[in-house]
From Swiss-Prot:
Pfam families: HATPase_c_3 (PF13589), HSP90 (PF00183). It is found in: Cytoplasm. It comes from Nitrobacter winogradskyi (strain ATCC 25391 / DSM 10237 / CIP 104748 / NCIMB 11846 / Nb-255). GO terms for molecular function: ATP binding; ATP hydrolysis activity; ATP-dependent protein folding chaperone; unfolded protein binding. GO terms for cellular component: cytoplasm. Residues 339-552 are annotated as: B. Homodimer. The gene is htpG. InterPro entries: HATPase_C_sf (IPR036890), Heat_shock_protein_90_CS (IPR019805), HSP90_C (IPR037196), Hsp90_fam (IPR001404), Hsp90_N (IPR020575), Ribosomal_Su5_D2-typ_SF (IPR020568). This is Chaperone protein HtpG. SMART domains: HATPase_c (SM00387). Transmembrane segments: none annotated. Residues 553-637 are annotated as: C. HAMAP family: HSP90. Keywords: ATP-binding, Chaperone, Cytoplasm, Nucleotide-binding, Stress response.
Length: 637
């Protein structure tokens, strides 16, 4: 962003950064059908400004001057084709105007642009609130936006102005032109947006979109007219549940969460006893874009007796960070600092209570409506499973609520899994990796499928970590199918009544011993496999170390000095193994090539590359040529 800066109070002209300019052009030339969203976004910003003033006034009451009651007013000027949204909140100084409205120094801008360009028009408007760029939605209906603001406690007032075409100006304004405190946003409406000067339309929009913000909203039909209160600022969460309709809950959810969907789950309760507080919590239907950003602020707003304190309090564990809403405490002191909040035993007790309540309500939904719960899981399952790793005190509950894709189907619970255990099965088997389709085709599953043993298919990054935390479910430990012995001998095969597999020939037994000796520098062991039925070989990890997927992750982030030697398991009844053993009986060079080819084949089946792709190709050609010569000479089987 470039600028012409005058510290003596003259006009200052600036150029938007490229991403912001592009964003503005998207708004100016918007084809979105639902442009009403702009008013909700401006009212939401105004309400936030009022709440921040109330918080700062706790330590500095002089900021309130003579005007202590927060308010938002919306003025219609049909003659001038203008609409103004004014609040008496915290206000902004010169630098704050530039920082808040001239730049968007956050990753959300670029992500918004990328997704909005790809979205259909109906979906694109929903991205406005989702990505936190709501102020700029004003340019969907205005060809110029003026923002006049005076910060609480300051004499100077400033005007920010832009036509959305790449530049903006910041100029000082006379005190008489500015609010005594707070911000006024004036939209110069485009010709096709004159409908937003209709009183009934604006009144309906306020009631539908913003009727439950905790600040009174008044509508002024024309300049100089008496304000008419449209919303009284009564906090929705203070009302009894029986008096609140589903649509009121949905409107409040969209306001507090910045979402455009319906809540998938609403939890509203009042706690009394050692701690007294009210919580109104929502689980969204769709995943906000920034849930995995490590520096993202938490999304529960903390109030103390209806005074907004912070939206960065540690009110829920990280694995529930998708929950939105408000918590209003009657016990915390109003003058508590944001730093002291995190150390408050009262807050710790509130966190424990609402965490338990959310989990309890999710359990009820899972039992009552598996399909609705399944949609929540599809959206938030990857982060919810972090609780298996992080929340030792609630691990059993989180495990019970978790759903998994398995070899038996999608969204299976562990209760379903344990209920389908096979005879003599003592473990919950899983296979972890990065690609669900590759997991489904893994040779490690063959022996389990042959016995009808269900295997969890884990493809989320967190999966490789929570399974190492030693969890069990209903007394059954989790065991990777790529680690240690499969222990399948005690579980009968589905085709147990058919003719048994032939005994391993002496030649194959000798060939396996040769593999073990030849590959001793590369593998820790070579052994006959009971997990393979269709594939010739596979790699597994030693019993005591990390499984194959976790080792790859740890190597990738530099947490391991080097890879451990895997175990090479060989299917002694596979035709390829038998043929290689027979063809190499009197040819050591052939057997050495065969040994290394089988190891590279196992690496490929495990999702890796051969150790040396060129040598792998040459070795394969040599084996085929020798095999063909021996077969044509009558030396093969």
């Amino acid at each position: 962003m470039t600028s012409t800066i005058d510290k003596n109070g003259a006009a200052e002209s600036r150029v938007f950064e490229a991403d912001v300019a592009k964003l503005l052009q998207m708004m100016v030339h918007s084809v979105y059908s639902d442009k009403d969203v702009f008013l909700r976004e401006l009212i939401s910003n105004a309400a936030d400004a009022c709440e921040r003033l109330r918080y700062e006034a706790i330590s500095d009451p002089a900021l309130l001057t003579d005007e202590t009651r927060p308010r938002i007013s919306i003025t219609i000027d049909a003659e001038r084709r203008q609409l103004a949204v004014e609040d008496n909140g915290i206000g902004m100084g010169r630098d704050e105007l530039v920082d808040a409205l001239g730049t968007i120094a956050r990753s959300g801008t670029k992500a918004f642009i990328e997704q909005a360009e790809a979205a259909e028009s109906g979906d694109g408007v929903a991205l406005i609130g989702q990505f936190g760029v709501g102020f700029y939605s004003a340019f969907m209906v205005a060809d110029q936006v003026d923002v006049v603001s005076r910060r609480a406690g300051a004499r100077e007032a400033w005007r920010w102005s832009s036509d959305g075409k790449g530049t903006f100006t910041v100029t000082p304004v006379d005190e008489s032109e500015a609010p005594a405190r707070g911000t006024r946003v004036t939209l110069h409406l485009t010709e096709d947006a004159t409908g937003y000067t209709d009183r009934l339309k604006i009144e309906q929009m306020i009631k539908e979109q913003s009727g439950h913000v905790p600040v009174p909203i008044a509508l002024i039909e024309k300049p100089g007219a008496e304000p008419a209160e449209i919303a009284d600022g009564a906090a929705l969460w203070t009302r009894p549940r029986g008096e609140i309709s589903a649509s009121e809950y949905a409107d409040f959810y969209r306001s507090v969460a910045g979402q455009f969907d319906e809540p998938a789950l609403t939890v509203h309760f009042r706690a009394e006893g050692r701690q007294e507080f009210t919580a109104l919590l929502f689980v969204p239907q769709t995943r906000p874009f920034d849930l995995f950003e490590p520096d993202k602020k938490r999304q529960l707003k903390l109030y103390v007796r209806r005074v907004f304190i912070t939206e960065d309090a540690d009110l829920l564990p990280r694995y529930l960070r998708f929950v939105r809403g408000v918590v209003d405490s009657a016990d915390l002191p109003l003058n508590i600092s944001r730093e002291m909040i995190q150390e408050s035993p009262i807050l710790a007790a509130i966190k424990k209570s609402i965490t338990g309540r959310i989990l309890s309500e999710l359990e009820k939904l899972a039992d009552k409506d598996a399909q609705a719960y399944g949609k929540i899981w599809e959206a938030f399952g990857p982060m919810f499973k972090e609780g298996i790793y992080d929340a030792a005190d609630r691990r059993d509950t989180v495990l019970g609520l978790s759903r998994f894709r398995t070899t038996a189907g999608s969204l299976r619970s562990l209760k379903d899994y344990v209920g389908a255990l096979k005879e003599n099965q003592t473990s919950i088997y899983y296979l972890a990796g990065q690609d669900a389709a590759r997991l489904e085709a893994s040779p490690h599953l063959e022996g389990f499928r042959a016995r009808g043993v269900e295997v969890l298919l884990l493809s989320d990054p967190v999966d490789s970590f929570w399974v190492t935390s030693g969890p069990s479910f209903e007394g059954k430990p989790f065991k990777s199918v790529t680690q240690g012995a499969a222990d399948l001998a005690a579980i009968p095969r589905l085709d147990a009544g058919t003719e048994p597999s032939p005994d391993v020939s002496e030649g194959v037994t000798e060939f396996l011993a040769f593999l073990k000796t030849t590959l001793s520098d590369l593998v820790s062991d070579v052994r006959s496999s009971d997990r393979l039925t269709d594939s010739p070989v596979c790699l597994v990890a030693a019993e005591s170390g990390p499984d194959r997927q976790l080792e790859k992750i740890l190597l990738g982030v530099g947490q391991l000095a080097g890879a451990s030697k895997p175990v090479l398991e060989v299917n002694p009844n596979h035709p390829l193994v038998a043929s290689l053993a027979a063809l190499g009986q009197d040819d050591r060079e052939f057997k050495e090539d065969a040994a290394r080819m089988l190891l590279d084949d196992a690496r490929v089946l495990d999702g890796d590359r051969p150790s040396d792709a060129l040598e792998f190709s040459r070795r394969l050609i040599r084996l085929v040529e020798r095999g063909l010569r021996r077969s044509s000479a009558g030396g093969g089987d």
